[in-house]
Every structure is written in structure tokens, then in C-alpha cells.
Amino acid sequence: AMLLERSGIQFDADALHTLENAVGYSTTELQSVNLGIYAGDLSYSVIFNQNQQSVEYLNTCRRLCDGLGVGDIINADLISRADNNRDVRDSLVDIVTDTFYELNGRFRENGMEEVSGLLAAGGWIEGVYLGTRSLNSSTADLKLRIAEQKMTLDNLIGLLGSYAPTPALTNMKEALRPVEAAFAGVTITENPAVSTAAVDGTVVISGGPEVNYDEATLTAISESIAVVRNQYAQ
């Protein structure tokens, strides 16, 4: 979400997942993925200073956490603290970050790796979805950051594959295959980092990964991520 703000795009409330839909998710699979999706919308709202909306999305995350048996983490005190800090963005960022770090830790401690993996997948899907809603007006920096998500997707697929297979994890890996195919149009070449000393004595680091892509690839990424996102966010 910070990346989206720095890239200069405008907040788009219409792109967010509908709050009212949360009551319809009764399976662990849908609750887990949509918790990640709503968490992505929560972060997006916080970063763009949509204060009231941020608290509403936090409340929605609380409902899904109740269904997953971890409702004590996003409790009334946390909601109240977020509400009291709604006009202090940095405080809200800290509250959201700490909360989802604790949630992920609880899932892992309780052997709920499936939930942890689906939560991570949902959050990543929503982040890319939000970043690709306005490709025509996107900055070059945002387009580059979207293309670089190929590396994050590779890591996500590896994470999902590291858990004991379940039908829900298999469903997610299958759903992400078209997204993987779209990202195949991105090539990333690792170049060794080189340090050079400038005239004023500062050290300049050059090199690092070189990312290549074209507009057709970004369009394919945008279309494929929308399909998988809307498959779960019904």
C-alpha cells in the first residue's frame, strides 16, 4: 500500500472489496483468503488517510477472525484504540502491522498453516489487484513495482508448496497458475552490485536486478489477477 501511495496514484474506493460480503464467508478457505483481501484494503485505506473506512475494514477483519477462532486478537480494545488514533496515520499503520504479525504468529503456533498461507495469498492478490486497476494512468515506477512482484509470487508459490497439501491450498495454487503465466512475460536478470566512490566521497551502489516487461504483459497480469481475486471475493 505504501508503494501505491508513493507511485502517485489516487485512492479508488470502488476498487475495494465490499464490506457487506464478509458475512457470507462460512468456510475456512473463504474466510482465510478474504481476511487477506480485506487486510489489503485496510492497509490501502490507512495509507491514503481514509480514516473512517480504515476502522470499518478493521471491524470486518475482526468478524472473519471470529470465524477462524482468533477473535481475541482484534478485540474491542483494539478497535477502540484504532478509532481513537484514526487521525494519526503512523499510529494506525503500527496497529495494523502489529495486529497481522500477531495473527500470523497465532496461526503458525496453532498448526494452522493452511490459514496462514491463504491469508498471505489473499493479501498479495489484493495488493496487485489494487495496483493494476489504473494501468493507463500508472507511473513508470508503479509499473516497474508491479513487474517486480514476479519475485514475490515465486516466493508465495514456494510458501504454499511448503505446507502439507490441503484442498484449499491446492485450489489456490491452481487459481494462481494463470497469474504465473502472465508474469512469465517479465524477465529479471540479476546483475552484481558494484560500489563506486563519487567525487564528494559518497558511495554509489549500482547494479542489482534488471527487470524487463512490456505493456501487453502488464495487461495480462492485470486481467489474470482480477479473475483470481474476484473468484474468491464474491
Annotate each language-model stretch with its function.
Residues 88-173:
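Extended amphipathic alpha-helical interaction segments
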